[in-house]
Amino acid sequence: MAFLNKSLLLVLFLGLVSLSICEEERRENEDEEEQEDDEQSEMRRSLLSTLGNMAKAAGRAALNAITGLVNQGEQ
């Protein structure tokens, strides 16, 4: 009976160790995924900012060109 109890305790202990290792690996994977998501969000924000700046510059250039044409037509 004592042998059976020791075996059962050993199996339970090994199961807990295995579960602990699996949970740790899962947490590490979740942390890596969060970092990747953060990096992707940062890249998107950077890209949107760049596109916004380009659109502003294009709008200013178009406005300047139209203003120049209007001024030439008035002369």
From Swiss-Prot:
Pfam families: DD_K, FSAP_sig_propep
Chain segments carrying region Disordered: 24-44
GO BP annotations listed: defense response to bacterium
Family: Belongs to the frog skin active peptide (FSAP) family. Dermaseptin subfamily.
Annotated function: Has antibacterial activity against Gram-positive bacterium M.luteus NCT C2665 but not against Gram-negative bacterium E.coli K12D31.
Protein name: Dermaseptin-related peptide
Family annotation (InterPro entries): Dermaseptin_dom, Frog_antimicrobial_propeptide, FSAP
Residues recorded as bearing Glutamine amide in the entry: 72
Gene Ontology CC entries for this record: extracellular region
Organism whose genome encodes this protein: Agalychnis callidryas
Keyword Transferase carried by entry: no
Propeptide residue interval(s): 23-43, 74-75
Tissue: Expressed by the skin glands.
Segments of skewed composition (Acidic residues): 30-40
Key words of the record: Amidation, Amphibian defense peptide, Antibiotic, Antimicrobial, Cleavage on pair of basic residues, Secreted, Signal
Location of this chain's protein in the cell: Secreted
Signal peptide: 1-22
